[in-house]
Amino acid sequence: YPSTNIKIDDFKRHLKIIEENKIEFINPKDFENELQNNKLQRKILLTIDDGFLSFYKNAWPILKDKKIPFILFVSTREVGAYNYMTWDQIREISEEDFVEIGNHSHTHEYLADESNKLIKDDIAKSISIFKKKLGKNSDFFSYPFGEYSNNFKIIIKDFGFKYAFGQHSGVIDETKDFYELPRYPINEKYGEFKRFKSLTKTLPFKYKKIYPDEKYLLQANNPPKVKIEFHKDIKNLDAVSCYSNEGNEWRQSNIKFENSTTLFINVAEKFIGERGRINCSLRDPSGLWRWLGIQFVISEK
């Protein structure tokens, strides 16, 4: 699928770009330490969602040969199904000390729309299968479709996960909510080389708080009233620019500062479809770009 796939030649070129820029890969086992240390060094945590067989056949031999660390997120219901990896293949990969097999739910359904009981039952089943097939569950979780609500986040935390990833863009740092960590999606649509090079030159955009705290929007709260409280040490914050896909069309957002560190984003039209997105960027004095992505899940109710 173009939305979840990248051509192998493009993938090889991306790895070469990372190597040429002397950017290191993070071993998932060192993730907690890396968040707190080595903050001046750009590093990449590679994640792969879904566990498709094409990954095992094409990308895995390359990553194994180069010993490039990564997290492979798998949904337990799909393992062994047509075009998906088997548990034997997953176990083979998991034996390498630079690989983490992350939890991606059991069913890979749109769980953010479901009741707490259904979410809990789904995650409990995936954990049970992880323990049976791999001997343990993972500390890492990836929300199906990158969609979450506050309730979903609490459930994931209560099950003992330490980190959970969405699909909103941005750079991770120690100030981020560990249960809504950003990632840059790279696929056939968003894998163009110029874009990829620009992503390797982004920095964390640190903030204290984003409002609304709930990223699952009922129609009564769509469009949301968005406010971001930034940290004081960000230079040239008044030069920030933001874009959103309100009204089903990407456009520059009208923004207003309440004070030197508090930004209001005027989302004038409703978000259409399943997801609403806002991206804010700011050129740093170093020449790199600070990047912050926000994703809302839009309820039909």
What is each of the regions a protein language model found here?
Residues Y1-N5, E34-I44, F52-I154, K162, ...:
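Metal-dependent polysaccharide deacetylase catalytic core of the NodB/CE4 family, i.e.
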Residues Y1-R42, S54-K57, P61-D88, I186-K301:
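Terminal accessory/targeting
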Residues I23-N27, F141, Y163-A164:
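Short, hydrophobic beta-strand segments that form beta-sheet elements in well-ordered domains
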Residues F145, H168, E300:
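Active-site proximal loops enriched in glycine and acidic residues that flank catalytic Cys/His/Asp
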Residues F161-G170:
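Acidic, His- and aromatic-enriched active-site or binding-groove loops in soluble protein domains
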Residues G170-V171, D233:
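Short polar/acidic secondary-structure junctions
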